[in-house]
Amino acid sequence: MANTKKTTLDITGMTCAACSNRIEKKLNKLDDVNAQVNLTTEKATVEYNPDQHDVQEFINTIQHLGYGVAVETVELDITGMTCAACSSRIEKVLNKMDGVQNATVNLTTEQAKVDYYPEETDADKLVTRIQKLGYDASIKDNNKDQTSRKAEALQHKLIKLIISAVLSLPLLMLMFVHLFNMHIPALFTNPWFQFILATPVQFIIGWQFYVGAYKNLRNGGANMDVLVAVGTSAAYFYSIYEMVRWLNGSTTQPHLYFETSAVLITLILFGKYLEARAKSQTTNALGELLSLQAKEARILKDGNEVMIPLNEVHVGDTLIVKPGEKIPVDGKIIKGMTAIDESMLTGESIPVEKNVDDTVIGSTMNKNGTITMTATKVGGDTALANIIKVVEEAQSSKAPIQRLADIISGYFVPIVVGIALLTFIVWITLVTPGTFEPALVASISVLVIACPCALGLATPTSIMVGTGRAAENGILFKGGEFVERTHQIDTIVLDKTGTITNGRPVVTDYHGDNQTLQLLATAEKDSEHPLAEAIVNYAKEKQLTLTETTTFKAVPGHGIEATIDHHHILVGNRKLMADNDISLPKHISDDLTYYERDGKTAMLIAVNYSLTGIIAVADTVKDHAKDAIKQLHDMGIEVAMLTGDNKNTAQAIAKQVGIDTVIADILPEEKAAQIAKLQQQGKKVAMVGDGVNDAPALVKADIGIAIGTGTEVAIEAADITILGGDLMLIPKAIYASKATIRNIRQNLFWAFGYNIAGIPIAALGLLAPWVAGAAMALSSVSVVTNALRLKKMRLEPRRKDA
């Protein structure tokens, strides 16, 4: 190969030499490619002809074989974007770079998230490429206070606006002269006076528009800056032309438009200031989450208590937390007992009792006891840090509904410039032949009324506010895509254990005396069965003292047999009693049947071969489960239960909570197949689960919803995480999705409708340029303001027929 290039790719998923050989063989089948795959280093070195192949082709080949190529993710702060055309252009350029897998740019947050292959490119190259487009970019510093930076930028915008307004106000009075025949001092109509006021507004205050326009045009793009610069420059320089004619004596009554250019810039700055202020409110939810973190921790060093900054705490450090203080990091109690307010995580206001060996979560509040704890997770690994990360990613992500706006934004400015030019030609040749001023005014109005900003802000602002509001209620969407997909759900499948039920068996019914219960609990205390644990806990709640067993024997499939203090104990089913010639009275037999039909595990107790009691144990239904399912039904959503339990138990639980469809006796590996069956019927399915065995079904479903009290595997596989275990958050999540998508549609309707209606009206000469400019400035503000309504969203689902 004469013209060759070499690249190295990090490969994931290889387990043996067969894997590396397979990848190497497949790559070498490509023309003019020489590939070597090393299993030990997990790298593929590929020499190729760049005229025939690119790196993405090799990546696709590897992924098609079922392996992965390692990617890194970087978040970038970008300043200088003024409208959707800017963010769309940056995104398009980044996605065309070698080594970039995917890039998204968010106009609202002024950030980019880029997934890239580290062997092909790096973060510095990404920053440099953005800077070449004329924008400032830097790698996001998570330790930097973003709030103060944005506050400073907002203050700078306000100062520029005030200066511009002070200079433009006298010029604005000239407009009232034309509109209302007002009398004003002659000074205000003096061309020199107008020139002196308008020039600093045009070239000092408005210099940012020229810089932005130049950088965009130099790189083959066009944005809002181009429209503003061209429109205001046309008015300003035509006024200069008229002023020169006046100085030469060619005219005694110059037609000046200094007020148009200056007032336009002021109005646009006013709109941008309002927009920035409104956008800063969209991130309030994230700020509130960050404010939950403790600032310091009390560490135990050499027997002394020392206060240190939170970022200096390491895994394994011994910390002391006193009443009224926040738990600094995630950890485990090694001394003391207390009650902890975990409402920030679970929404449950009642404090949770904590003892030695119990886990505690950072940023929760220690209520009434001093505890000593060991730090197990710190920094970015804590529960709160992971919640913040999910919210950040959701707020910076894109929903598919935004694609149309992104496509249009890329062509918007050139089309508007073309329409403005056509407007000028039509006016000067057909409407007012040979008359320059009306043609100029109409074309300027077209330029300044067009607003690509509203298009770019319509979706991301709603996503930011909607996901933030959901997070405040304990609902974590992992991205805008999932917000959009959730509103289409018409079927919800709930796992039973740990989702509908608490996942912890408890004693629901007991008939017998305390001595029988004491002997029963003593017999069961050495058993590892979860039902035994429930019985022991029940006895402890009754403050009964447990003794020791003399003998203990499990009777497989039937129960247990034990000897305690010369008492012979039998605990089990009918068969165990029959085998030991113990008869059942009819009322006991009826009770046993009743409990079993109700989905409970019922056990008979015999002491010294005489029946002395009956006890029933069951996994109880969660509080509000019935209410949550009723709300889902009211929303027109079908609810089904999926479980590995037998049909009788499953139907008993389903009857309690109001579920009609029960899919029982399902093996864990069959859950995903059951979801697929529902999807084949044309249903949009959400799966709700909490266990490791739910993960495949969560992935298979259109939307996977993990209960936050569940396993990390389930949470990782899900698209939405419900903090705590409250099922009422499921209908709230669906309503939040519907409300957010409805808000996005309102924004897009306004953004498209405004431009579709506004541009023709301006072209017909029905709007003065300053009115058009005011409309443009306020259009994006209206979109952001509408999105901010979601902050007050009450997550109360509506009936489908409401």
UniProtKB/Swiss-Prot annotation:
Keyword tags: ATP-binding, Cell membrane, Copper, Copper transport, Ion transport, Magnesium, Membrane, Metal-binding, Nucleotide-binding, Phosphoprotein, Repeat, Translocase, Transmembrane, Transmembrane helix, Transport
From the UniProt record, report the name of the gene that encodes this protein. Answer: copA
Task: Answer yes or no on keyword ATP-binding.
Answer: yes
Query: Can you tell me which residues bind Cu(+) 2?
Result: 83, 86
Molecular function, one GO term: ATP binding
Entry's transmembrane regions: 161-181, 192-212, 224-244, 256-276, 411-431, 438-458, 748-767, 771-790
Name of the protein described by the UniProt record: Copper-exporting P-type ATPase
The record lists its disulfide bonds as none
Primary location:
membrane
Instruction: Spell out the InterPro entries in the cross-references.
Output: ATPase_P-typ_cyto_dom_N, ATPase_P-typ_P_site, ATPase_P-typ_TM_dom_sf, ATPase_P-typ_transduc_dom_A_sf, HAD-like_sf, HAD_sf, Heavy-metal-associated_CS, HMA_Cu_ion-bd
- Active-site feature positions: 495 (4-aspartylphosphate intermediate)
Positions contributing to Cu(+) 1 binding = 16, 19
**So where does Mg(2+) get bound?**
690, 694
Q: Which GO terms describe its biological process?
A: copper ion homeostasis
Q: Which domain of life is it from?
A: Bacteria
- Localization annotation: Cell membrane
Q: Which Pfam families match?
A: E1-E2_ATPase (PF00122), HMA (PF00403), Hydrolase (PF00702)
